């Protein structure tokens, strides 16, 4: 359940970021068409609703379709690997987990960099003009591909866990259970994502009702919606470290057992929380190591050229 919840938060964060980027793109395109490119891109709910509302569900549907394709690939692949090279499952999952940690650290560094070096109006205008020059459809497709890539790693973990549960069952049962879980998870997760990203539209709809109670509820949703998306972004990034760190830790048996043993010596409450906290911290450390490794490789390649 913890993995499923963390995976959902990671996906929500990815899609929330994706929708924000596409919202900026859409608003820029609209301003460009009008022959105006303003400085103010504070994408509040009212400004974004005309553009963003048209693309929210298509974007979620695009990622959901990619998620289904991921599972169509992963289910038979998992069965083949399990049958012929079962030892490869754990290393492959660990690579995926390390990649999630890497993405989490990249997000944190990007956020810190943005806070450290705030743009002046000229830099902001230059960046926005560069963004506006891009093809909106290609931009959207590229963003969706990134979300589908994250989904692939999380889907692989869910498929692997399910396969571990039904490993001793006949092949037909394994296929049916894996396919059923894959379908239910995809429909459930992206159905919930679709509801969450339409909260602001629900708020507008309720705010226009004649009932004072409905209007108050609608206004409340409009106030909550942007804060909810910000909270999801923070919690989703933490979930990347939690899921990714957990995958890597589980793949290193001595480390996993040491954490479990240490947690078992603590009080009941601490024993329940400690493994999660340690997975989170280790996830950040793992991500940091991968980022340093990637930057070192990029530096060497730059020197080679």
Curated annotation (Swiss-Prot):
Record flagged with keyword Ribosomal protein: no
Q: How does it sit in the membrane?
A: Multi-pass membrane protein
Q: Give the location in the cell.
A: Cell inner membrane
- Listed Pfam families: DUF808
Which residues are exposed on the Periplasmic face of the membrane? Answer: 173-176, 253-271
Q: Does the keyword Protein biosynthesis apply?
A: no
For this UniProt entry, what is the primary localization, expressed as one broad class?
A: membrane
Q: Name one GO cellular component term.
A: plasma membrane
Q: Which UniProt keywords apply?
A: Cell inner membrane, Cell membrane, Membrane, Transmembrane, Transmembrane helix
- Membrane spanning residue stretches: 72-92, 93-113, 152-172, 177-197, 232-252, 272-292
Q: Any ranges marked Cytoplasmic in the topology annotation, and which?
A: 1-71, 114-151, 198-231, 293-305
What is the name of the protein in this document? Answer: Inner membrane protein YedI
The lineage is: Bacteria, Pseudomonadati, Pseudomonadota, Gammaproteobacteria, Enterobacterales
Tell me the gene name. Answer: yedI
